[in-house]
Amino acid sequence: LESLGLFWDDKISRQSENLQEYKNILEILKSKNLTYNCNCSRKQIALSNQSNFNEPIYNNHCRNMQHPLSNKSAVRLIADHKSTKFIDRTQGPQHNNINNSVSDFIIKRSDQIYAYQLAVVIDDQLQSVTNIVRGADLLNSTIKQYYINNLLNFPDKAYMHIPIATINNQKLSKGSGDKVNVNNFSLILIEGLKFLKQKIEKNIEDASPREILKYAVKNWDIAPLQQIKNIELNPTQRLIADSAHT
């Protein structure tokens, strides 16, 4: 990141340092009767109906069971029939019934680790985050986080879900072992801007990463990204990705 001219604005925040905050918020949600303990296995959940996001939607089996908390219990947040409505800057208006879209979801895992959905909302609040930019494949996660954010009366955030990079319609990601060629940082930035359909002037292509970023901020245009969830890498961009494996 530093070689690309990307630096953080404040001190590094680690989730391991925020465990007490997570616990406090979880207790608040429990006190409002918004949670319950769940003993369902992954297999049971996988047999549930599929949501419109192509992932298992929980059937709320344990909602009224009143299971005592144990080391094997997950904690779920009750998803009522309220609508989540927000305007995404690239994907447009988002309107979902949280219960129909994702149903009751886990906020503390059965291994006693706080779930990402809860932790990231609290992290953003602690860091005074106002604008969230992420891949379009995480729109489903945003629905859950938006719901938690509202339950806790945290200030609304502005969202933008940008297209993800794909090769043959398969997501390019670190999770699948994909890497980036780090031999030419300026080229990486230029191709990244082209991927995001930004106009590139000839005189900026050989500039330093810092100069390229200044140019990108000044000339940023969101219009070409409207309603696009994924973009296939062009041959040059594929070469950058592929050459990292050689």
Regions found by a protein language model. Name each.
Residues 37, 42-185, 200, 233-246:
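Active-site cores that bind ATP or allylic diphosphates and position pyrophosphate for catalysis
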Residues 183, 187, 212-222, 227:
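Amphipathic alpha-helices and adjacent low-complexity segments
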Residues 150-153, 194, 221:
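Hydrophobic alpha-helix feature that most strongly marks membrane-spanning transmembrane helices
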Residues 16-19, 135-139, 182-186, 206, ...:
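Generic detection of long, well-ordered alpha-helical segments
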Residues 188-195:
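Short, hydrophobic/amphipathic alpha-helical patches that form generic packing surfaces
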Residues 1-44, 196-212, 216, 227-232:
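Conserved alpha/beta enzyme-core scaffolds, especially Rossmann-like or related mixed alpha/beta domains
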